[in-house]
């Protein structure tokens, strides 16, 4: 089959201490400190064969994530920008949906023809973090499109336990093609759902929510905030096209952060009280978190979703005197996240279809 494959050179930076685990597995914990000179091409790849508990999916739709871009974009020394867990070469693509075309001999929950979307975090279920209920922090984690072959391909094999049926989404949109496209947005939406409602504990209806960034994660956060009853949703995004999308999915106010002082804007909108819930989805916390800090309501929350391997200036006294909290979030697995997002989309309470703005073939 054909797949969109990224390869890169293992060339750790002089100040990066490669662990024995990294040497043994070929996986880099901090990708932007190890992988250099990335090369991206469509090429032949072996057809996947299902294991006993696996299904083979014919990929129907796969979204382009900011992470995919950061695998190919580089710094001045030609190191990839993505700072997380990676192993190359591999097929990219992890926001996807597909139709079951083959099942392993022990598969019990799926059959040929089923429509599904899939978790990207391949957790083991045996390690201490998994057994304690933290699958997103699995000690043996693999990630589709990061460390194992992804879905920018004709087919992909996955364990049935990571698949979720999307019939409700297809029924909502009235046809399979649109259902598959919208279902491919489930994974990034689950990343925002996990961060906002599992990690940070959500917010009360009527609370004011700010979102920094309007990529797929930020747009999903806006849609979820609207569905959860936010009183005001304000978004900050440098792209004019994405600002328009932010309005379409639920933002009440949108701004170019280069043209305003975000913290001052939020204080004005809230009449001096500050915003209750802040979402960092821009991957630029050194710029965004200080603005959130200026506009933290009493008992306010900041949740970090965007990936950025950098230190952030913050006055911790602000968290103390405002009884506020800062949450880090990773992944999307467990905690009813996938089924709840599918229910929201199927019920029509969350519609991110406007953010599908272009379609490309594998070639």
Question: Each predicted region: which residue ranges?
Answer:
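Glycine-rich cofactor phosphate-binding loops and adjacent beta1-alpha1 units
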Residues: 6, 200-205, 228, 240, ...
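Glycine-rich beta-strand-centered segment in the early N-terminal region that forms part
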Residues: 46-63, 77-128, 169-170
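NAD(P)H dinucleotide-binding glycine-rich loop of Rossmann-like/cofactor-binding domains
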Residues: 83-89, 94, 124-212
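Mid-domain Rossmann-like dinucleotide-binding core that forms the NAD(H)/NADP(H) cofactor-binding site
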Residues: 161, 175-260, 264
């Amino acid at each position: 089959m054909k797949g969109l494959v990224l390869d890169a050179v293992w060339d750790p930076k002089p100040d990066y201490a490669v662990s024995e685990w990294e040497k043994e597995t070929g996986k880099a914990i901090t990708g932007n400190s190890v992988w250099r000179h990335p090369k991206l091409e469509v090429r032949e790849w072996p057809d996947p064969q299902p294991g006993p508990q696996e299904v083979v999916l014919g990929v129907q739709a796969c979204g382009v994530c900011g992470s995919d871009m950061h695998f190919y974009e580089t710094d001045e020394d030609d190191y990839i920008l993505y700072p997380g867990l990676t192993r190359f070469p591999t097929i990219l693509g992890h926001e996807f949906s597909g139709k079951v075309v083959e099942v392993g001999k022990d598969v019990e929950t799926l059959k040929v023809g089923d429509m599904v979307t899939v978790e990207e975090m391949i957790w083991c279920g045996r390690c201490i973090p998994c057994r304690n209920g933290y699958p997103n922090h699995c000690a043996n984690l693999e990630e589709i499109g990061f460390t194992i072959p992804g879905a920018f391909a004709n087919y992909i094999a996955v364990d049935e336990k990571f698949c979720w049926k999307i019939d409700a989404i297809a029924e909502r949109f009235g046809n399979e093609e649109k259902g598959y496209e919208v279902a491919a947005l489930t994974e990034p939406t689950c990343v925002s759902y996990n961060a906002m409602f599992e990690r940070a504990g959500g917010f009360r209806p009527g609370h004011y929510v700010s979102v920094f960034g309007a990529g797929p994660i930020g747009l999903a956060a806006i849609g979820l905030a609207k569905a959860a009853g936010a009183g005001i949703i304000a978004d900050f995004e440098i792209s004019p096209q994405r600002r328009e999308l932010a309005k379409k999915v639920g933002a009440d106010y949108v701004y170019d952060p280069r043209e305003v002082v975000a913290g001052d804007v939020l204080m004005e909108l809230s009449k001096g009280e500050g915003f209750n819930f802040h979402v960092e989805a821009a991957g630029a916390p050194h710029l965004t978190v200080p603005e959130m800090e200026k506009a933290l309501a009493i008992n306010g929350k900041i949740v970090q979703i965007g990936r950025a391997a950098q230190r952030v200036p913050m006055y911790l006294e602000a968290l103390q005197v405002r009884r506020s909290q800062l949450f880090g979030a990773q992944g999307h697995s467990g905690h009813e996240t996938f089924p709840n997002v599918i229910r929201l989309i199927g019920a029509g309470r969350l519609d991110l279809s406007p953010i599908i703005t272009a379609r490309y073939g594998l070639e």
